[in-house]
């Protein structure tokens, strides 16, 4: 059967491969070098703009032969150059073409060609990898495999405007992350590329600008250097500002704004600098206008969101610039009408990419509403905004869902909105759906937002708990992702705050004592702190304290002992002592402290600690244990006096810290009463 099946498959492939395509490849093997050269030139003309022909030639094995000719010392420079040109043309086809070229190890061969003294050949050898590296299927690491390549490319920057354009383009596509930035920076990228910003060639200026944007992104070292670079007597930020003026091409305005944004976010330019407030921010707002192309609006909104994200003043300025909040509402109505876009190709492109606009709008709304209550109110009052966000939570695109959750999370920081809009639109329902099955990046933001919805004043708290939130959150605490563990335990902490005994019992049952112990020994400090916060909230109000300690007392006391003995910071120890103070406030629970000499000695030790916070927390424990109005107080006071606690209280009553002094005096009063 296998033999019978093979024939039609081979026939279908071969039917695609025309006789003329075979003829082109056959000529590459001619013994006459002139005929080979002419064959390569004819092949070059045949493949221009013809993807089918490119695919045919690749299937017929043209690539290995072209690479062989390119690397042969006996080949003339003209032949080598033409081979590089054809390979560059083949790379401009489909992604499959690029994969085929990569499989033939084209990059090392072309980079080797850069050692030639011939400029035309060098340019052809650069043009092809420039095309290959711009493809998403090409691993950037191929540029960094040989350590001699980057310094050689830096040296070639001075050869011609084409070497400048292609090399900058290669750098901007292959600079992904801090390791690549460091390599390029250490090989003099800033000094070698800076002067290209004043090149007569627009393409060179543009590629140099793109280089600086990827070099500066989240990189303080590069950004701090860029601020002080002079080009023809002008500082780089001044050059970038000139490049984002309205009379410059949009691509240049946008990329300059990105450079200044990244330098600002990296701490090299102040957020209140005029070049940010009066130039960069207004330029990015302009890019959000509906007159701009879809990709310009997307890039403008996303860059602006990144610029203003940490700074409340920039958020306020942006929110009142050119009616930005209303302008972003248009991102959800795009394209508004078929007649508005006469170019059918453009319409088709925009319909396929309209989700990117929604994603960008959500991102910018999230940044705008991060801090200011009035801005959040304006966003929510924008037409159908809550409905749009809720719809965004169930979009097929993961990126849109993530941006919608982030936007909702930003708005959920408002007490007012949690009580009104979030309740009116039952936001918790789609959010719980998102939490059932989503990638980690969405889960982190969605669970963080759930923490806000579970705050005690939120009307959504009750229905969320009724829909099985406790179990879901306990599941998150077992995640390998520390951010999810933190959010799971944080949300449980909020749930336990002033909760009924039944909810607290549900939490302890679903979480299990074993998991609680695991969380208390978690290597992530945030997880530990939130777990202590949860315990503190569980152990509040006397009946609850006594009930929980009657069933889990032994394990909780064990955990407290371990933490107080461990190498933990002041905040962790303070929280732990506060838990002890809560236990000491129980009616029967306090016996677990009084019968544990080890714990009593630890409380005594922390009363004499050098840190006031720990002394105060230990004082709360003592005050709760000796309070006069409670049964058995006399025996407890006597035992603590025998331990030397009263002497310590006398010392603390002389403390320069007024709070500590008052608490000590109040405790001593209990002995005198």
Curated annotation (Swiss-Prot):
GO CC, one annotated term: ubiquitin ligase complex
Phosphoserine: modified positions: 337, 512
ARM repeats (start-end): 51-92, 95-134, 138-176, 178-217, 224-265, 269-309, 313-352, 374-413, 416-455, 458-497, 501-540, 543-585, 588-627, 634-673
Major subcellular location class: nucleus
UniProt xrefs under SMART domains: ARM
Pfam families linked to this entry: Arm
InterPro entries (UniProt xref): ARM-like (IPR011989), ARM-type_fold (IPR016024), Armadillo (IPR000225), ARMC8/Vid28 (IPR038739)
Electron transport keyword on record: no
PROSITE patterns: ARM_REPEAT (PS50176)
Residues annotated as transmembrane: none
GO biological process: proteasome-mediated ubiquitin-dependent protein catabolic process
Modified residues (N-acetylalanine): 2
Subcellular location: Nucleus; Cytoplasm
Keyword field: Acetylation, Cytoplasm, Nucleus, Phosphoprotein, Repeat
Job of this protein: Component of the CTLH E3 ubiquitin-protein ligase complex that selectively accepts ubiquitin from UBE2H and mediates ubiquitination and subsequent proteasomal degradation of the transcription factor HBP1.
Assembly description: Identified in the CTLH complex that contains GID4, RANBP9 and/or RANBP10, MKLN1, MAEA, RMND5A (or alternatively its paralog RMND5B), GID8, ARMC8, WDR26 and YPEL5. Within this complex, MAEA, RMND5A (or alternatively its paralog RMND5B), GID8, WDR26, and RANBP9 and/or RANBP10 form the catalytic core, while GID4, MKLN1, ARMC8 and YPEL5 have ancillary roles.
Protein name: Armadillo repeat-containing protein 8
Species of the source: Pongo abelii
Name of the gene: ARMC8
